[in-house]
Structures are given as structure tokens and as C-alpha cells.
Amino acid sequence: METVAAAGYAHGAATRSPACCAAMSFSQSYRPKAARPATSFYGESLRANTARTSFPAGRQSKAASRAALTTRCAIGDSLEEFLTKATPDKNLIRLLICMGEAMRTIAFKVRTASCGGTACVNSFGDEQLAVDMLADKLLFEALEYSHVCKYACSEEVPELQDMGGPVEGGFSVAFDPLDGSSIVDTNFTVGTIFGVWPGDKLTGVTGGDQVAAAMGIYGPRTTFVVALKDCPGTHEFLLLDEGKWQHVKDTTSIGEGKMFSPGNLRATFDNPDYDKLVNYYVKEKYTLRYTGGMVPDVNQIIVKEKGIFTNVTSPTAKAKLRLLFEVAPLGFLIEKAGGHSSDGKQSVLDKVISVLDERTQVAYGSKNEIIRFEETLYGSSRLAASATVGATA
């Protein structure tokens, strides 16, 4: 199925060819709940490969899922090879490959965006769009043309959009199309976040109900970090020059180490417990690694296999991070990697998503760091019984 790459934007040397750029065909603007255009940037080859009858509906049995994991996923595998070994659910494979194609195009559009006084823009067909809106449209198109997504919503379009896929054997997807879009002009790393839930529900569910989550990281390297419910670990794929996603790392444990990323520091003004926590990091000579982008700040915990990210609220610094679009998917990635997440009292994967725009504070990191986070903010930790707080450099 990697052959569908030809229908997307060929990466590497081909992407730098003016002729290739001119030949690129995009659809009209994505129009939720309206008639869809006859063509897409995916082209007819992807349309042909994603016919609704391509894969049988229905969830795999637990026995089949376990059997699929007997074949070890290997470093060096392509995305398709990895997914074929990681899950027997062909619908989920198709959805993740389509999202990978969209993120490859987003990476190119971010890299070539024109940044003026108010926004960074690039072309989408005949339109000039802010790059976050362009990413939003590309991801909605990817989900529509996967033919296995029932509902989708995004941080830019926080209402359920019917993608036309089945309920039984299909999925609902929530995504942040371009987290950190305000720092594109400064050339900082930005990214895409998405979570995949089975069926047609995105409320009344928890982050723990996800069957997969992923993030795309658009920085010096373009990477695609994926975790699946029935596959151990969190897995990183690198976008090669020829446009292929290659499996380059798996993470199954997050150890102790003195690295911190403190978000929403203005909350330390009137949240003395958060101020105490940040001062502890400084006093203990933790290494500060904070970019202002949630995706790279969380991704470094998975890559370095240590550290903590915090984003805490206060009476005057309210919660901004969205549970559905950002917090739960990233929590899934961290916990599948062997780390922990917390809203101060519980794992973010245990929080019921009551409304699409629900917001929360959060911390991600190693077990001991989450214990320290919970104990400092609330006096006790649900994790403390089985671990001793302490970090090593």
C-alpha cells in the first residue's frame, strides 16, 4: 500500500522540482457536510485503492490480535510493513497510512510556507491558506478518502463531521492539525496530533479507549510517531528522501533523568504549588528543554526516554490544552512508551471526555516525576506506593 505515495506529494528531490510542484493537484477547499469534489490531492490511484469494499468491516478477535504480534516489528520496516505486523485490523492500517500521506504533504507545505506579518500561508489548489487551516483540510481529506472514518473533528472545526465511513469496523478521529502554528514563522518545530477511537463516539469515552494515536513532527527531521492499543511500545518513523516512512525507533520504557519542560509558567504567579515544583527543578539543576511547542516538548520524552512536561493551571491562567485533540492522544503515546500521565490526580487516559472542547492541565513523564508532580500539587500520588521519588542525571 506504500504505492499510494505516488498519489500524494513525492518527498525529497522530487518535491524540489518546479515541474512536480506545478503538476500537483489539490481539491477545492474541504467543505464539511457538503458535496465533495470529484478529485483530491490523493488522486485516483488512492481512490481506487480505498474502495469501501477493500477491507471487511468488524473488529478482530483478541486471539487474532495476539497472533498478529507473534511477528516482531523490526527497525527498518516501512510504515505498511510495520502496521501489517502490528495489527490484523486492515481498516486501521488504511487509516494510519492515509494520515501518514497527509502529514508528508503538510511537512512540505510547512517547510515552504510564506510568512508575513500576520500568518504563514501556502497554496491549497487556487487558495492561499494559513498553514494550520491547510493542514486541517488535508487531514479531513485523508480521513474521507480512507473510507473507514465515520466521524472526525479538529481543533479548527470542533464539531463532528461525517466522513462517510462505517460505524461497525470504522473509527472516529480527533486531531490538532498544526500544534504550534504560531511559531512556524520563527522556524521552530511544530506538529500534528491525532487520536483514533473505535466506532462513532468522541464523547462519553476516555483516552484509554483509543485504538491508536500519533503525532507528526515537522522539524529538522520529519517523523511520524505511532502507538497502537494491541502493539507494545511507541514507534517512530522517519520520512526518507524518497518519500517513504521508515521505522527507526521503538520506545518501551521512560526512565529517570533531570530534564524538564515547564509550560504555562505564568501560572506560577498565583499557584504556589506549581511555583514550588518549578523551583525544585531549578534547585536540583534539571536541564531546561522547552520550545513552546507541545509536540516537540512531549516527543523529546519519548526520544530521550526521560524527563517531564508540565502544563499547570491557576486562578488567572486557565486550562488551554484540549483533552480530546491534544492531551489524550499524547497521553496514549507516552503511556504506551512506558511513561505516565496525570492531570494532578489521575491518568489523563482515565478522564471521561464529556464535551469536544474540554480542557485540562497535564503532566507527562517518568513514574517518579509524575509522583513528584502529583504530590507537590495535591499532597499525594496514586503511584507512590510502588516507587521512590528520585531522579538521576
Curated annotation (Swiss-Prot):
Coiled coil regions, renumbered to chain: none
Binding site for substrate: D179, G180, S181, S182, Y290, K320
Co-factor(s): Mg(2+)
Recorded metabolic or biological pathway in which this protein acts: Carbohydrate biosynthesis; Calvin cycle
Superkingdom of the organism of origin: Eukaryota
CDD domains: FBPase (cd00354)
Record protein name field: Sedoheptulose-1,7-bisphosphatase, chloroplastic
